[in-house]
Amino acid sequence: MKAQEVFNIVANKYDLMNDVMSVGTHRYWKECMIDWLEPFVGMKIIDVAGGTGDISLRFLKRVNGEGEAVVCDPNDSMIEYGKKKNSSNQNIKWVTAPAESLPFENESFDAYLVSFGVRNFDNIKKALDEAHRVLKIDGRFICLEFSKVQNRELSKLYSVYSKMIPIFGKIIVGDEKPYKYLTRTIENFPSQERFKRIIEESNFSNVEFRNLFNGVVAIHTGWKKI
């Protein structure tokens, strides 16, 4: 099963899917991501693999609506669901495009955000190069993603829970295959240190990461410098 097939199936239950995969804690993790971003009035962000616009809404709330967000997602179903869900918000633009080929000019954005999306990119290196291209000088890349648990006992519990996720998926959307795919992408995603190096290979500077919940997820960030 490919990423686009998965999101065609789960689009109208995407937020519920995040609840299942994170036991509801994705809301706290996303707030931590926005905290670290330190949004400012007039900031322009691109929210890649933005799904239903959850991250963009959190960003706009922090700047009291005085900012601009572009939600970019390769999946038409996700974009249409996001538009419908946020039809009253005029500060969000919606664009259907893959992360590897963004339809924007160089140095267009102050920040590039991706939440639980990078592991589904077809080509992570190419997507990161695109992130670097569309960011302004001193622009910031910030990514929230499932990662490698650092605590042995917690890792065992997390492994057991991961095996249960497809069962929940069967109950919620009537199909366990999307959830098997998503748990597999989590297992195959690079470690925190390895992903840090991958980001650096796309010419980002001052790259660092923070673990949340002992590495169940990590937030990586880096800057575009001259």
Model-derived features: where do they sit?
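N-terminal, positively charged/glycine-rich alpha-helical extensions of SAM-dependent methyltransferases
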Residues: M1-D15, Y161-S162, I172
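Hydrophobic beta-strand segment of the Class I
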Residues: Y14, Y112-L113
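Conserved alpha-helix/loop element of class I SAM-dependent methyltransferases that forms part
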Residues: V23-M43, R58
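Class I SAM-dependent methyltransferase SAM/SAH-binding core
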Residues: K44-S101
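C-terminal alpha-helical "lid/dimerization" subdomain adjacent to the S-adenosyl-L-methionine
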Residues: C72, L144-I198, S202, E208
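A short glycine-rich, Lys/Arg-flanked "PGG" loop and its adjoining helix->strand segment in the class I
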Residues: K125-R140
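Core SAM-dependent methyltransferase catalytic element
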Residues: K196, S202-I226
